Amino acid sequence: MQRRDFIRNASLALAAFGLPSLPACAASKSGQMGLRRLGQPQPFDFATLKGQARALAQAPYKSHKRVLPGRLEGLDWDQYQSIGYRQDHALWADQPGKFQAKFFHLGLYFHSPVRMFDVVDGKAQELAYDGAAFNYGKSGIKDGELPADLGFAGFRLNTRKDTDRDFAAFLGASYFRAVGKEGQYGQSARGLAIDTGMGKPEEFPDFIAYYLEQPSADSETIVVYGLLDSPSVAGAYRFAITNGDVLLMDIDSALYPRKAIERLGIAPCTSMYQVGENDRRMAWDWRPEIHDTDGLSLWTGAGEWIWRPLLNPRNLRFNMFVDRNPRGFGLLQRDRNFDHYQDDGVFYEKRPCLWVEPKGEWGEGSVQLVEIPTVDETFDNIVAFWNPKEKPQPGQELLVGYRLYWGAEPPARPPLAHCVASRTGLGGVVGKKREYFSWRFAVDFEGGELARLIDKGEVEAVVEASRGRVEIVSARPLREINGYRAMFDLVPPEGSTEQIDIRLFLRSGGKTLTETWLYQYTPPPAGAPERTLY
């Protein structure tokens, strides 16, 4: 599987598929400040965009990637980051509404021009690229050096009260991200994932055009439309984005496959996990923990709540959680303690959770989790998405709706106690010689009824393992969090390095008290340091 090689294939000429194609000289005069408009406004709505996507799917796929002109092709990270969009060219900056949009320049990883349209009163008009709209900083690029029809890489949204801080950004392939009140970017979402974690190159669809609908003066929501294209599928997306303490994206999509898709990923979440409390395989850094998110949360169609801590595995790891009509899932950052990260530059403790809430019934399928080894926090190595059981076929229309919530807390939480920490280490009894290898797990739960049961001592830990032996099981009050700590040792089969699946929950008198904690443990090979400590 390819990692980080996801920025590919953006739009060039789409006139044959329903988008107007106009030369720069056809730019129309506009009373609005900022970018010029091209041609005359054309009627536009979501049905129009679906028609464009359907037409794309009926034609052979053509790559949208291009070689960038001049110095753009060789920019490094610092040079690209120094290119900024000028406030006096921001879209809607002169309008009475609360929001405005700014645009990203092509360069670095972003080689695919994306067409931008302004939608006013149900009519769309393309926005013309203008080099004068950018400050080129340390890039070495001079105003007027680049072609007049270069195009954009993406866009960002902010409020007119805070023109320097984004609350959402769409940039690269079909990637987009947003923030809650903490104002810190972290994980990303994608329009679609195709063949992720299959041991072959992943396909990364591109948003090749965006239509930004001008909001009314008192609107709290901004609507964005995206046209998606890839070798396997074309699609139309509608995003209704409501900024707030928890940012909401209400999404409707229509997909039109060009060919059968082996593994289709709906509502994909993309994150990074390098080092955490439970997995210290890559703990070479001075910081105790390094991750955008620390676990996958699932609310199944049957009503069960599941928490699966993330891992940075030695080899690519793929898991599927079979379900029917899931109620929600997401990659969460539950650990909000700065002391656990000690990074005052990127603030991992402020990074948003991303919760997916299906609209309607999604039927049979599975939430799939892909974990990829990484040695660097700049590599996104975690992907979670919904994979429908029925594989979409060419000629079909697949309609999918869902909501994305970005913020410190997801909108849905277990009524039971939830896991707040998962720690692991060498097993055995302190002060006694270890006769065999074992690995210890300490899992902390808080919430629900646990605080009421602290003084009653009626809580037990229920642990199951797919192989090996579980021993020294306990559930003890943890007054510091008004909760409980479950502990147990796992003894793998002698000489085995085969993966072991573990399931844990707390109960009292036959009543379940916590969400279900799932884990995958791989015993170390013979000669590994942890096997020599007994």
UniProtKB/Swiss-Prot annotation:
Post-translational modification comment from the UniProt entry: Predicted to be exported by the Tat system. The position of the signal peptide cleavage has not been experimentally proven.
Pfam families: MdoG
Keywords: Periplasm, Signal
Main location: periplasm
GO-annotated molecular function: carbohydrate binding; catalytic activity
Signal peptide (from-to): 1-26
Biological process annotations from GO: beta-glucan biosynthetic process
Pathway in which this enzyme or protein is active: Glycan metabolism; osmoregulated periplasmic glucan (OPG) biosynthesis
Family: Belongs to the OpgD/OpgG family.
Biological role stated in the UniProt entry: Probably involved in the control of the structural glucose backbone of osmoregulated periplasmic glucans (OPGs).
Name used for this protein in its record: Glucans biosynthesis protein D
Organism: Stenotrophomonas maltophilia (strain R551-3)
